[in-house]
């Protein structure tokens, strides 16, 4: 009878502990810059003094696919006596983005909460380029930047559609390229706008058409002058060499003819003597 009462008392205490134990999160959404560090935090309340030996805390990423994921979060155990389960992730990468489940077990009681981590990389550096289309009065304006998530590109006050494409870098970032081809009005400059919808961030770059424009190919008029010049120079050099050769042959023949009579006269004089 006493044993039964003890069992009932123990079970009642366990239910009370389970009812009192709760897990909360001070922050559900973390938006972190790519490459920086982050600490995801869960708070727990035991209702009394914390028994560190009875606590088990873990942070698990909720995967939507079957690909293996290496958990990179490290539990900061020095925070446990304060009722905090803090998980540190260094140098946040794109693959770290997603939803996480913070699970804390305290004896027979347990509870969990969800945390969401989003990664952003600002399109702060926009590279611009101006290209003159040969044999036309059109130009190609290019804006290119790298960031995350995928940004939208627009060209304000332009009715001509732009050709915008993107690719992924080895780090998982997006390299976005937008090309606009048009006949520019005199004295007008243009700008491209990168709008990152998920993090509500806007970046703008201006393009000055007065700056030096690079032709797509070498000017054809240079070829029209250079090639005939080379041909004429080659013909001139070949003609000079041929004339010089003929002149040398004539001079050699003239000297040979002059020497022969002198030799004959000498032979006749010797015979007479």
UniProtKB/Swiss-Prot annotation:
Topology check: give the Extracellular ranges: 20-220
* Any one GO BP annotation for this protein: cellular response to lipopolysaccharide
SS bond partners:
42-102, 143-192
Q: Which UniProt keywords apply?
A: Adaptive immunity, Cell membrane, Disulfide bond, Glycoprotein, Immunity, Immunoglobulin domain, Membrane, Receptor, Repeat, Secreted, Signal, Transmembrane, Transmembrane helix
Coiled-coil features, chain-numbered ranges: none
Which tissues is this protein detected in according to the database? Highly expressed in heart, placenta, pancreas, lung and liver and weakly expressed in spleen, lymph nodes and thymus.
- Start and end of every Ig-like V-type domain? 21-118
Alphabetical list of SMART domains matching this protein: IG
| Assembly mode | Interacts with PDCD1.
The name of this protein is Programmed cell death 1 ligand 2
Query: Can you name the source organism?
Result: Homo sapiens
* Gene for this chain: PDCD1LG2
